[in-house]
């Protein structure tokens, strides 16, 4: 979805996260994010796993940052902060919302994340 050629960068980002909400709901909020799970459970026990999880988050954040930068270039997202900073913040927020959704067995935290992220954090 992040590379969909017919959607604007902003629309691609929004649809991407809305799709992740649907996946979490379909899985009944079980399992969560593999990277997040490894980070929480194993990063202190294995330096190799910690390094790979860190690289995974960096790669994911860079993918999001690339789309944010496109949206900034098109005036769809403010240029007040670097795309990399916004992407890291958005990804960290998503991971927190996903943990809360798992605990509450509810999509409300994920929907709140999407609403606030796209109304405020990634606003023009």
Model-derived features with residue positions:
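Amphipathic alpha-helical segments used for helix-helix packing
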Residues: 12, 27-48
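Short amphipathic alpha-helical interaction patches enriched in hydrophobic/aromatic residues
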Residues: 1-3, 24, 43-46, 97-101
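Hydrophobic alpha-helical bundle segments that form small-molecule/ligand-binding pockets
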Residues: 5, 45-49, 57-83, 123-124
């Amino acid at each position: 979805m992040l590379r969909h050629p017919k959607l604007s960068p902003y629309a691609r980002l929004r649809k991407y996260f809305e799709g992740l909400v649907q996946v979490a709901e379909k899985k009944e909020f079980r399992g969560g994010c593999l990277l997040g799970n490894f980070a929480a459970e194993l990063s202190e026990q294995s330096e190799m796993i910690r390094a790979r999880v860190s690289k995974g988050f960096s790669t994911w954040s860079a993918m999001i940052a690339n789309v944010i930068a496109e949206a900034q270039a098109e005036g769809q997202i403010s240029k007040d902060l670097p795309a990399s900073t916004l992407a890291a913040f958005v990804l960290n927020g998503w991971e927190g919302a996903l943990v809360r959704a798992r605990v509450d067995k509810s999509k409300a935290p994920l929907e709140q994340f999407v609403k606030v992220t796209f109304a405020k954090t990634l606003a023009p």
